[in-house]
Amino acid sequence: MLSAVLSANPGDFSASLVRLLGLESVESLSETLVEHYEQMSAHPLDINTSSRAELLSTGFFTPFQVASILDYISDNGPILSFFELSGIIGIGEQMADDLRWFFRCDPPRRQSLKSNRAYRPEVKFTGSIRESVRPSGVGTLAKCELAYGERVTALMAIRDDRPAFSVSLSGRRHLEKLVVGGFNARFAQGLLLWNGFSMSGLYDLAGFSRNPTGLSSSVSSASLVGVASTWSWKRSVLGIGLTEKGLAIMNYGFYTARGSYSLTALYENGACGASADMKATLGLFTLWSEGALYYKDGVLGSAAVGGLYCNIAYRKRVGAFVKARSESFSVQNSNVTGLKPGQSAVGLGVDWQVFSAVGEVLFRGQELSARGLEKWNWTAEWGEFQIEGELRHSWKYASGMKNEMRASVSASGAPFYYGGRVQVHKGKDWSGLCYLEAGLRQALCRVLYFDARKWDDRLYAYARDVPGSFSVPAYYGKGLECSLFVRDPKRWAIKAGYTFYFSDKADKWEVKAYVRF
């Protein structure tokens, strides 16, 4: 049964985002990616009035899923609940529950009462102070958001002494969106143009194939700056943009009930590139591919990726992929599927309810390497508590073998939350960490112990952070970290932490604050 309310677990947002994007773990997220989806979560889209281009631009849906949603609304009327959404072909209970963060299901009467001319001002400020082995530093991030109804949004940010802005207009009829200032561009599978959001090289099975978001407003440090717009008519979507550095981009996509087909082109200072992409669902099978060419300084480079899913049943599927990159393929804003120049790879994956596993073998001349991961997730109920657990093993073989085992468990029952993790890594030497965290939904305390004597055996663990900031610190040395996280979900948040080192390394501390007006 689909849960009627969101869990009290304060990490649910990150967990939902990991599942929707098909990532291996929360450590695979990036600050710019989290910032983008936090902004989207603050102003959820109405799934009943969102266009095809708007649904695709979230990056959560395949063209087949979007077609299923639009066909359902056309045949049956508005979707009135997330339980109803879960019954649509290609969605399911888990995905519908995760989408609660980013969408709303407004009934027609409520839609008619809402004014699209309401002025919505919002100002956010994030500040941090750090003291460590490096000279002390003060970091600030101030963000301001002004909106006029649902159509006009202005974003402004100052990171330390670097200002950024972005103004977005949602148009009518054929003009879907116009952006002036900072923007991100994510097309096809990312071979030619995929800026702003970085992900790890190896994904969960769902992440073998990416869902592009097109052009979106952004004030992150990795944004492009210029003018961009998205146009749509019937089943076609056209995205065009021009940056201050002279990068011209264009993407044309054509969508059917079963798939999508697109062409992407770019030009910058004498260099040019083009790619073709397709994704189609036929019965139990989903096929996707993209091929790209890039010409610069008299040299032509190429890259390609393709794969196949077999969707046996809900939460039961297998998949495979191949990908390759030439030595001379060097697009600046590309995310070339985790490959080095001249490298190619093949991979397999399976997702079978609570168990999933992926692995790939990479080739580069005479060099051979491989990597993979296996996960087992489980849930249980004990009284009023919802208990979730995960066992995870990841491995990598290059010049030597590296293994990492991770076991984590959390229990939440409003208003309480408890969690912990044990993580062991075997590379050149042994290393490990463990932590316990407990508290209320608005206040959480964590104590973490780590022992990683060599830098090559360092460990990473997600640390809960204030909105507008995201951190996956590397733990190196031997020490104990204590942190406290307190928040008012709608107004403010404070995080304070202190790390004691049991060696000659200097202790360090950090304080972060977030205020929203």
How should each PLM-predicted stretch be described?
Residues 221-225, 238-257, 261, 267:
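Hydrophobic, small-residue-rich alpha-helical packing segments that form membrane-like cores
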Residues 272-273, 283-284, 288-517:
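Exposed, low-structure sequence patches enriched in small/polar residues
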Residues 162-240, 319-324, 433-435, 442-456:
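Outer membrane beta-barrel
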